[in-house]
């Protein structure tokens, strides 16, 4: 599903196809709450009010999330700092210890790319206010500003991030529970 399909310059057939996808999607139909999370390129931010207007007819609670945190990667776009540390430990036949977790959480905080998205997040916040929908800053549940760390692992020790900004299944479940408990 692409929010950009609701951009004023989008092709009409793209809008129709997205609307059809939604109308046939069992998860969408049966849900009470719709959470909108995206990488949010500028054209998608511009299309968002039209998309929200379309969603109003379904009478569902809508929650808008800020632009996704992304993290600098090394060597390849699919290798996170976590991957590199685990690979280093594996090569050296080392064991993963608590201090490695703490070190990686600090590295994740330093490598997050949030300043680049300030303008887009301000626009998203303003759209949420105007539309009277809840707005959540991902930074609030991904990172701990006071301790300058970002979660790298679930409480069960699974990686949260697949790459620069996508979550693993275990990571998505962990973050969803964390978000739910924050209310």
Which residues are covered by each model-predicted region?
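Extracellular glycan-modifying ectodomains
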Residues: 1-183
């Amino acid at each position: 599903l692409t929010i950009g399909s609701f951009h004023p310059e989008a092709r009409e057939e793209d809008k129709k196809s997205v609307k059809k996808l939604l109308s046939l999607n069992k998860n969408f139909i049966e849900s009470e709450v719709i959470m909108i999370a995206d990488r949010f390129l500028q054209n998608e931010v511009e299309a968002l009010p039209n998309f929200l207007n379309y969603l109003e007819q379904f009478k569902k609670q809508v929650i808008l999330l800020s632009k996704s945190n992304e993290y600098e990667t090394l060597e390849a776009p699919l290798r996170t700092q976590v991957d590199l540390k685990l690979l280093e430990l594996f090569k050296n036949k080392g064991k993963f210890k608590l201090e490695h977790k703490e070190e990686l959480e600090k590295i994740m905080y330093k490598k997050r790319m949030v300043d680049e998205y300030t303008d887009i997040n301000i626009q998203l916040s303003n759209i949420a206010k105007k539309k009277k929908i809840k707005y959540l800053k991902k930074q609030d549940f991904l990172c701990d500003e006071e301790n300058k760390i970002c979660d790298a692992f679930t409480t069960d020790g699974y990686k949260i991030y697949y790459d620069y900004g996508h979550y693993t299944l275990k990571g998505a479940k962990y973050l969803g529970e964390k978000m739910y408990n924050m209310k």
